[in-house]
Amino acid sequence: MNEASLTALLLTLQYASLATAIVFVPGLLIAYVLARFSFPGKVFVSALTSLPLVLPPTAVGDLLLQMLATDGIRGRDILGVDLDILLTGKAVIVACAVMSAPLIIRTARIAFEGVNARYEAMARTLGYGPVETFLRFTLPLAARGLLAALILGFTRAMGEFGVTVTIAGNIPGRTQTLASAIYSAQQVGNDNEANFLVLVALATGFCAILAAELLSMRGVPSRKSL
């Protein structure tokens, strides 16, 4: 592995970690609301959170580009802030966050739906408030599924390519990730480097999932423990 590829790998780990950390807690809250509450427009919200999964990554990238570009629909006009982040590491984080969020939300929602709501009702009758019930009962019971959501979100962020190259480019040492480094190596005919990077991606992803499996088998209370 040359220096540029090593830098791309380290940047990928950094950007994927930051993106996952940013969307994980909001994703859990959205997943819990979708799993536990009924409200007008719930189907619409659920479909909207899954939209990046079915859209072509380049389409998602174009939508983000329109929000972030100086001649597009400015983020300043929508959010009241100037989002001048194109072709920067921040754009990579945005791309990774947008594409990993749907997996986090869907997996966490399944985990919350797997927790029997009667346990939460019992906790409320014992005097626990909604927040305390969520923290002391719901989260531990759903922990295995939530850990799976975290790992899936992280690995999806690591593998992000289409949205990243659209809004962040493929700048070595700045916005080039592992996926774009593989693409660059293929484009110049450096098959050995490309194949090696593919193996690195496989090994990294496998180790991440294996770690999640090992952690999920330790110290996680099951439903039967209540």
Residue ranges and their predicted role:
Residues 2-113, 137, 141-162, 185, ...:
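Membrane-water interface segments at the C-terminal ends of transmembrane alpha-helices
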Residues 40, 128-129:
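Short coil/turn motifs that cap or connect alpha-helices
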Residues 65-66, 163-189:
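Glycine-rich helix-loop "coupling/hinge" segments at transmembrane-helix boundaries
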Residues 119:
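Helix-turn-helix DNA-binding elements, focusing on the entry/boundary residues of the two helices
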Residues 123:
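The alpha-helix within a helix-turn-helix
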Residues 126-127, 140:
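Glycine/proline-centered hinge or cleavage motifs at structural transition points of membrane proteins
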Residues 216-226:
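Short cytosolic juxtamembrane segments of multi-pass membrane proteins
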